[in-house]
């Protein structure tokens, strides 16, 4: 689940809390556990000390170690909004007419944010991802000692790069050593410093 509203639905399978339900502290974890969420995603804004405190209280946690963080869901298509058409409905054919959904949204400062289209019954929803990927491999030894499950999220990596990243993070879990090259533009998150 990525939205608290999803927790009100009856689920025939165990529910894991995704990035949208990220956990900052024990009180938040206890709240979701009371709603039968069996696995929780820790906030990417927690530092090493805060993570240790959270993990000490028990629970089943996963940490996003690699990938582009989803920043938002867009209910209004940037292409249609730019043209002044703010309606969003299933009759829209802009993507089909113009060769598909734009894959990149470039902001006024030149940052490039990948978009992924979800076609829904009522129209489209676009996932907007961070302009840089998170790659915590440079903290491999620290991640290993945290003894937490790691989530790897792929958006635009080639199958070869995906295999390389998966194998590398297996090394992080097993021995505290990452084997892949880290993109110079990647962010390593807040593990050492926290939010300033």
What are these model-predicted stretches?
Residues 1-31, 35-196:
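Active-site pocket-lining/capping segments in soluble small-molecule metabolic enzymes
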């Amino acid at each position: 689940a990525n939205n608290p509203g999803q927790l009100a639905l009856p689920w025939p399978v165990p529910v894991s809390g995704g990035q949208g339900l990220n956990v900052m502290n024990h009180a938040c974890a206890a709240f979701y556990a009371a709603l039968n969420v069996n696995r929780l995603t820790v906030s990417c804004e927690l530092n090493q000390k805060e993570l240790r405190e959270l993990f000490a209280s028990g629970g089943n946690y996963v940490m996003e170690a690699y990938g582009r963080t989803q920043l938002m869901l867009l209910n209004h298509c940037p292409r249609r909004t730019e043209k002044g058409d703010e309606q969003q409905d299933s009759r829209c054919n802009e993507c089909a007419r113009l060769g598909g959904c734009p894959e990149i949204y470039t902001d006024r400062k030149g940052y490039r944010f990948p978009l992924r289209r979800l076609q829904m019954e009522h129209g489209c929803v676009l996932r907007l991802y961070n302009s840089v990927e998170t790659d915590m491999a440079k903290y491999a030894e620290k991640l290993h000692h945290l003894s937490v499950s790691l989530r790897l999220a792929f958006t635009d990596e080639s199958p070869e790069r995906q295999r390389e990243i998966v194998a590398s993070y297996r090394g992080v879990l097993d021995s505290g050593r990452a084997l892949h090259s880290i993109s110079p533009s990647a962010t390593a998150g807040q593990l050492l410093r926290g939010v300033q």
